[in-house]
A protein has these predicted regions:
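Active-site loop/helix belt of alpha/beta enzymes
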Residues: 1-78, 133, 169-171, 177
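Charged (often Lys/Glu-rich) extended helix/loop segments that serve as interaction or gating elements
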Residues: 51-180
Length: 180
């Protein structure tokens, strides 16, 4: 509001406020409904601008497209190591899952395997040491999980396909399939 006031004092007539984006996808079941964001934005606009509110633009981004996509990966190998059970899948940091770096995004996971679960370190297929999706906070996956089973990353419709590298370490980029 202060910037709009300063611009008006200089003879300009700002009429549009772009609030940008950042509405979250439903990664862990703790996102608010979009109406909650709308209510908070409306209240802030009234508080800041009173009756002289500008037209407002928001860019909900992954809040719209995130839930529209699921990455379906295949288990390449399951290995017991000194630091725990490692599950290697064909979707990794370099094949679309770069937002798992530093475990920045925690995707909801489901698998084709069933039964009791246990902690595991989830890693991508390349030999690069950075190709580890979840290590510091291991994920719970079925103990029966084997090579050939699937692991699904839910709410992964935002950015994953465009982040996929082409031919890194000889791996093909992530394939995209549209489903009705």
């Amino acid at each position: 509001a202060a910037i709009f006031t300063a611009l008006r004092e200089r003879g300009l007539s700002p009429w549009l406020l772009d609030l940008g984006g950042g509405f979250p996808a439903e990664h862990q079941g703790n996102s608010s409904h979009p109406s909650a964001y709308g209510e908070a934005i409306a209240a802030a606009l009234i508080d800041c601008f009173r009756v002289d509110q500008p037209r407002t633009l928001i860019e909900p981004g992954r809040g719209i497209v995130g839930d529209a996509g699921t990455v379906v990966s295949t288990v390449v190998e399951v290995v017991e190591r000194g630091d725990g059970r490692w599950v290697f899948v064909d979707a990794g940091i370099f094949t679309g899952m770069v937002e798992c770096l530093d475990e920045a995004i925690r995707y909801r996971l489901s698998t084709s395997a069933i039964g009791p679960t246990g902690p595991c370190i989830l890693a991508g297929p390349t030999c690069d040491s950075a190709d580890v999706l979840y290590r510091h906070d291991p994920v719970e996956l079925p103990l029966s999980l084997r090579a050939g089973d699937t692991v699904r990353f839910h709410s992964a419709g935002a950015y994953t396909a465009c982040y996929s590298t082409i031919g890194f370490n000889g791996f093909a980029p992530m394939s995209v399939r549209l489903v009705n």
